[in-house]
Amino acid sequence: KIYRTLLCGSLLLFSLGFSSCEDYLDKEADSTVSEEEAFKNFRNFQGFIEEIYNCIPDKEKNNYTTSWNWGDDEIFNPEGDSHMTHQVDLGNFRAWSTNNQCWLYRTGSDPTATYHPNSDGNAKFKHSLWPHAWYCIRKANIGIANLERLTEATDEEKKLIAGQLYFFRAWWHFEMMQYFGGLPYIDTVLSATEKMSLPRLSYQECADKAAVDFRMAADLLPINWDNTTVGKQTAGKNDLRINKIMALGYLGKNY
């Protein structure tokens, strides 16, 4: 009788646990956002772009000391032998990919990490150029491919969205070109199953492609977001929004 009771109890607990797990793992229909919904209006589309802004690595705060003067003669920290500034002096140019000491590459990089003093104080260490660049270039290409879905928007709103996307596609390529020279310029949405066989371009070829995107962005973006209908909703807080001056500045710096 005791064994029978234990067996029945075990079966009951097992069935309850199984049904509980099944309910927990079931995906709610409302949790999947369709492309039509994600890109239909300015607010939704801008939310998609915000993550690209968030991914920009802070080169001054990505480590406990700055790391910007690689290959120069200045000594910024006599004890910082593992830092890239010293590693470049030693000729160890590949240390950026292994020592986890700079903004060019960090393991554990997370596009969704946001810094707040009371939450994740290490979020500033979770943004780095190499992994985020490819992630954001893909996001920009997805956005550009879905511009036609932006149907509930004014002409001004459409230009703001498109301008930011073209700028960021060029900017992430430009940032990598400074350190790696020519590389494939990704201007389409690549399939997850597609073989990566794009040719490596020369620096000049990459710069030419980036210039087209920077020029497009400059033509679409305003000088001052505060003077736009959309920008008036966040007046005084638009200083870091990508604008025409930034696009033209990088267009010139690109060469």
Tell where the protein language model's regions lie, with residue ranges:
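Short clusters of hydrophobic/aromatic residues that line enzyme substrate/ligand-binding pockets
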Residues: 25, 33, 38-39, 115, ...
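Long, intrinsically disordered, low-complexity segments
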Residues: 24, 53, 79-85, 133-136, ...
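Conserved, well-structured interaction surfaces
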Residues: 42, 46, 54-60, 88-180, ...
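Bacterial Sec-dependent N-terminal signal peptides
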Residues: 1-30
